[in-house]
Design a protein with these regions (language model features):
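Serine residues within intrinsically disordered or low-complexity segments
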Residues: 2-4
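Preference for intrinsically disordered or flexible, low-complexity segments
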Residues: 16-199
């Protein structure tokens, strides 16, 4: 497999000091997404050559790198049009495929998640986790290595196994690999959870 896949699953190099400062500056220029606090780090938004936002018609060099769930194939949405809901309204679009929720649905939180939060790239489509009667914050992709580095592997993997989805994922979970973890943190109790998806 190493010959056919090369360094496909290698961890990216850490950002240099200048790159970190640049990313922080870019992040501060974005609207705040409570359920997706760093959409630049997760790849939901990218910085590139200036494009026209199809929602507001303004130029932006930071734009959505995924395609929203709608009839038209919409590209290059600016962060503001997602944050204020204008893009969702104009194109009858949603940015998240599915989410878990227990109890009575909260229409305001649903609106904020599905219509005003950038999604994330996954194998089978986003599945957003919830906790404490609210949606969790999406932090990015992880494998077992990253969970161990954070000191949360045992708890997070045990909680995931209790969901009775994929079983015994610890040996196979690789950041951005064919079996990948998607890390979330509760906005209230701060508990970490993962969702696992496979190609």
């Amino acid at each position: 497999m190493s010959q056919s896949h090369g360094d496909r699953f290698a961890l990216p190099c850490p950002l240099r000091k200048e790159e970190k400062k640049h990313r922080q500056k870019l992040l501060q220029s974005l609207p705040h997404f409570i359920y997706h606090p760093d959409p630049l780090a997760t790849g939901a938004f990218v910085e590139g050559e200036t494009k026209l936002c199809p929602s507001c018609g303004k130029e932006s060099n930071i734009y959505y790198d995924l395609i929203p769930y709608c009839i038209e194939d919409i590209e290059y949405l600016c962060p503001m049009c997602i944050a204020n809901g204008q893009a969702a309204k104009k194109f009858d679009a949603e940015f998240v495929q599915d989410a878990e929720w227990q109890g009575e649905l909260d229409s305001e939180k649903n609106q904020l998640l599905f219509c005003q939060t950038p999604g994330y790239s996954s194998w089978q489509g986003e599945y957003w986790l919830s906790c404490c009667q609210d949606y969790c914050a999406y932090l990015g992709t992880v494998g077992t290595r990253e969970l161990k580095d954070m000191g949360i592997a045992e708890q997070v993997l045990a909680d995931y196994e209790a969901r009775e989805e994929y079983q015994e994922v610890e040996d196979y979970l690789v950041k951005d690999g064919p079996i990948c973890g998607y890390l979330f943190r509760c906005l209230h109790c701060q508990k970490y959870q993962i969702w696992v998806d496979a190609d």
